[in-house]
Amino acid sequence: MIDLSNATFIIPIRIESDDRLRNVITTTSYLLENFDTNIIIKEVDKTSRFVSDALPVLKNILSVPVKVKHIFEESNSPLFHRQRVLNEMIHEADTDIVVNYDCDAILPIDSMKKAYDMIKDGGYDVVYPYGWGNYQYQVKPSDDVVSDFLENYDYAILKSNSTIYDAQSGWVQFFKRSVYIEGGMENENFKAYAPEDKERLYRYQKLGYNVGRISNFIYHLEHARGQNSWFTNPHMQSNNDLWEEIQRMTKEQLIEYYSNQSYLQKYL
């Protein structure tokens, strides 16, 4: 077990397809089997598929306890407000490091440990644990592929079922929790699928925080996409308009903008 005990992985989920269910099981298993850490999963949906479909499988396949804090919010809304859900988990976490973690992402163990140490001991505020550019393995998973991977965590299994693609700013970020909060957390004015990944990186760099990056690959387990995870999101135009507006701000205007966001009052 790798010691990441002063970190909390925050994972927002809505299990809207069988491949997303498989990904949640795969990534949760990977984290629990390899790291001594803390995990919060917040699920927003009509019913909890994590409890009914994922948890029984995890209990069956894991050699360790399912040490996950699962929070379920019942909702019939078609909107999965990922940004709000993340903020609620940032607020819930009580460790010095918070990891915004996409349920479809797998990172090499060495990258996870290095990102953690860069914040804990290296003076970084934010770390992107993968490179910029062609550092993404887009994995086309099947039940057999992920089962083989979970047997011994051999990344070659994922590589052999993938294509290399662009990586920039999404999936996983390690944050000093105090900095995440000080810098405005997730922008809840973005709704569902949005340029929030670009904005987050842009913002924390513009505000002068020490943002680091690790030149290694990330594995993204592909999945079906609905309106909450693709450009068909009905809020896409307003999301893009907000992103354009933020890019026109000076550092001082950006600080002023985030100091006046009403959603932040919930977390004080």
Per-range role (PLM):
Residues 93-96, 185:
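Active-site acidic short loop of glycosyltransferases
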Residues 50-92:
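Active-site-proximal specificity loops/subdomain of glycosyltransferases
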Residues 36-49, 71-75:
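Short beta-strand/loop segment that forms part of the nucleotide-sugar
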Residues 6-10, 38, 199:
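Cell-envelope/extracellular polymer assembly enzymes that use nucleotide-activated donors
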Residues 108-188:
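Conserved catalytic core of nucleotide-sugar-dependent glycosyltransferases
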Residues 96-106:
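Short beta-strand-to-loop acidic/aromatic patch adjacent to the donor-nucleotide binding site
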Residues 1-30:
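N-proximal low-complexity "stem/linker" segments adjacent to membrane-targeting elements
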Residues 20-23, 167, 189-268:
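C-terminal catalytic/acceptor-binding lobe
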